[in-house]
């Protein structure tokens, strides 16, 4: 198996020390896991970083040291928006990333942040063992990526001047929606939209380029938006914004692993799904306390408000997505069968 050259690595935006090392379990397999979130420890910090660290510890333990993994937080290995395509090429081993970030290249993946489609954790995590999850996993595999851990997160909105709760509140605001489909809904509601990863939100809000940001409950605190926001709309009660943000692996690497290594990786990945769910739910509650302590006014959504957002999404984002291709229409139909 060849190792990519330093020139190739630099062309892909990979830090020089992160040249990939593959090998059999006997020789030792060292994985590189990249993500955009702040780094911490296995016990403290952003739960997505903690989940990656737990994954690394568990595969090392189960393989008796034959497999190891190094975590690169804060997009320190490569830029956020380069990570998915790098996995497809075999130039990055693993990433924990919002799947909709790849929706520009693979329209099907915008399903991972389709407003109003998933409105609860049980529904979202239920995708894995239903036709929608099986078909989505099959599609990803055909594009060179394997889902290791299914993670869903509810989200909310942090805003600088006025709250973003009702559909009508969006009019005239500059809002980061988090996906192309969410942007379509916001534009229909009268907002201007901007597209950027969550680790760039602080600067955008600080400069006034962004009035409000929709992002996961965890990112609302990890990126310290409470320092800038006067209002928070939470996802702790109800939400129309649920994001699929799995731990992924390059299929090029996965296919080179031994059967034993694959079994360890998949079993550990599955075991961590309940941890991801409970941590996400905890953050849905914790974010409100953090923003209240910072002096922001906190708002919650009720079913009537969520339904209005969902109705707008059905007429805009859902239709747009279904019209992209027969495959998009098929995936949306399967997702709707889970309870949307």
Which residue ranges define each predicted feature?
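N-terminal secretory/targeting leader peptides
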Residues: 2-5, 10-20, 26-123, 132, ...
